[in-house]
Amino acid sequence: MGTGWRRAFCTTAPRNSDAAAPDLDKQRTGYNLTPSPSPRSCVKLAFLSGGSNPSTPRSTSSPSLRCRTADAQTPTAEQTSTPRSATKSPRLSLAAISNPSSPRSPLKLSLFRNSFKFRSTCGICLNSVKTGQGTAKYTAECSHAFHFPCIADYVRKQGKLVCPVCNSIWKDASLLVPHKNATESPLDDSVSVIQEKRVVVTSSPRAKPRPKQSDYSRFYDDDEPLLSPRFVTIPEADENCGGEEEDDVPQFKGFVVDPNPSFAVKTNEIPVNGRDFGNVQVSLLPEAAVVSVGCGYETRAVALRVKAPPPLTARGGVGRRLLDPSQRAPVDLVVVVDVGGTMNGAKLQMVKRAMRLVISSLGSADRLSIVAVVMTVPKRLLPLKRMTEHGKRSAGAVVDGLLCGQGSNTSEALKKASRVLEDRRERNPVASIVLLTDGQGQLSKVHTNQRSTITNVGSTRFAHIEIPVTEHGFGESGGCSNAPAEEAFAKCIGGLLSVVVQDLRIQIRVGSGSGPCEISAIYLCNGRPTLVSSGSGSVRLGDLYAGEERELLVELRVPSTATRAYQILSVRGLFKDPSTQEVVYGRDQSLRVPQAVRSSSSPRIERLRSLFIATRAVAESRRLVEYGECTSAYHLLTSARALLGQSGTVEAAEYIKVVEAELVEVQWRGQQLMEYQSQHQQQHNQRRRGSERETTTTMTLMDENGEPLTPASAWRAAEKLAKLAMMKKSDLHGFENARF
């Protein structure tokens, strides 16, 4: 009677009795080595242990599940010998909180209690994170709370943004990113930003491994942000409220827009930095060529030259002064360095010196990226980074680490450079790509005094922005490190960086007081021959560097009765100021077309005629190829080649090669188009045969009522036929031997 209440509880023992036998002595002395919770913890979680008595010792000597009874009021020595630190240890895992062997252990409830515990306590130091204790609190995306110094120290040591409690990946942890990147070197941080993101994803043991991204699916949007914009203070209402501001307000002239607005520039619109951005020179060459004579009219060709103004520092004659960042707009520059098999020894050293010159010439507002042509896969060694002191040190370390490799793929490197500029998040007013190579395997050199349609300057356009691609070759004499070569390279880089005209547009029309004539077409000679306008209209030339020239070929159609009259062309344009991004309107200029002579042996006129024939043929053939008319394009180029061959001059022979090269390309495109059409026709025929076969099969599987033929419908049809046969037989019963 005095023993008090007794409680029955269930315990589990391991299956291996031999391994559990040596542990009996330790259990008797008060040390519990089983994964079951301690007696003090079972008191707190009695509802999870099935009502067990915390004062009863547990035995694991038996390999079976059995019940025991113990006195609830008599404390044993084994209970008192349990360490207090072990009973109040806050580091209780999920296995220690809930007994998985008990049939009454609610796993969901234990998970909820576990998650609720880590919301009110720090997941690292396991102390309370309640407010008012003088320590900042950080709550992660997974709802786990931490002390900010604890989680910052954890991220700094581990180098990854993963929850230490549930191992979930944190996507939005902007406060912890500086602590994650604190121990990384500046060069590694600037070179492998995208690789670090992959490491974070794959470092979590619960994260699924992602397939490696290909080079073409990678986005280069890790460019360094631009300088913070300057805030311009807005004056109050009582400041500068003179009567002069009211005079500058234009009067309302009605809702009818003037079709011919004035493009004159006011004196206060011209920048005050010493450069006259409105001084874009537009002139006609002093010769005009008669291309063809038709019934009642003749076709003439004139060349229009557009030249950008030179920079102010060019007057001093010092090439390095062209690189002054204060005299130009900020630029995003991508340098493609060829470090193939031919760029070894002295050439590689000269490339490094040129790169150091480029780095030193850029300012803090400029950004630089480096792409190396290595083997067949180009590599981006440096993202778009502002050329501050830290950025210049990072770029210099990349340049010093350049080594000569084997093979080169310049076209893929230029594609990657274009991707770098396409994927950038922020944009400077000017963007440029520079290719540094020895020139071997690239475009062949052209003669200096030749008006060739293929030059060393091309352009890659995207999103209405022109990215000029410039190739600077070192040639066989690349090892000669003399001062004039570096001075010439400094002038070249200075000209590339000094964009003085941006998004230039020119409108050409017949001026007032001109003789009867008509503008048939306008062709662009520089780069790829292109039809930029059919008739009078606006011509977009894009960005112009300091002192850069562009040539346009204007096709005029003059009546035969007005061949002796003077024709006048009116030219006006507009562009953006690269430094201020303001639109500058140019003044109207009237240009007098020179008189053309039908029969002339002048080399300049013959060269102009040959240039016009080749440019027009190439431009029109490309336009026809875009519409899929390769045969017409081939006949057009063949006629142009025959027409150039009739003159027999040296100038015509040079342009015949250009037309023949275009003929080869048109033939190749025609073959590709024929193969595509044949494959498309075969696929169409296969689809049509398949549809006919399906239609035939469907028709054969239909009954007389148009319903699909199934076993049930076939059985019903057979029953119907059997009934009809029986009815006919019954109707003829008794008339077998009858004669009618």
Swiss-Prot record:
A zinc finger (RING-type) spans 122-167. It is an enzyme of class 2 (transferase). It catalyses: S-ubiquitinyl-[E2 ubiquitin-conjugating enzyme]-L-cysteine + [acceptor protein]-L-lysine = [E2 ubiquitin-conjugating enzyme]-L-cysteine + N(6)-ubiquitinyl-[acceptor protein]-L-lysine. GO terms for biological process: gravitropism; hydrotropism; protein ubiquitination; root development. Residues 49-67 have a biased composition (Low complexity). Disruption phenotype: No visible phenotype under normal growth conditions, but mutant seedlings exhibit enhanced root wavy growth and curvature in response to gravitropism. SUPFAM superfamilies: RING/U-box (SSF57850), vWA-like (SSF53300). Residues 332-476 form the VWFA domain. It comes from the Eukaryota. Pfam families: VWA_2, WAV3_C, zf-RING_2. Residues 71-90 have a biased composition (Polar residues). InterPro entries: CLCR (IPR051266), VWF_A (IPR002035), vWFA_dom_sf (IPR036465), Znf_RING (IPR001841), Znf_RING/FYVE/PHD (IPR013083). Residues 14-105, 677-709 are annotated as: Disordered. GO terms for molecular function: ubiquitin protein ligase activity; zinc ion binding. Gene3D superfamilies: von Willebrand factor, type A domain, Zinc/RING finger domain, C3HC4 (zinc finger). Disulfide bonds: none annotated. Keywords: Metal-binding, Transferase, Ubl conjugation pathway, Zinc, Zinc-finger. Expressed in root tips and leaf primordia. PANTHER family: CALCIUM-ACTIVATED CHLORIDE CHANNEL REGULATOR, E3 UBIQUITIN-PROTEIN LIGASE WAV3. Interacts with SINAT1, SINAT2, SINAT3, SINAT4, SINAT5, TOR1/SPR2 and FIP2. E3 ubiquitin-protein ligase involved in the regulation of root growth. Acts as a positive regulator of root gravitropism. Possesses E3 protein ligase activity in vitro. This is E3 ubiquitin-protein ligase WAV3. The gene is WAV3.
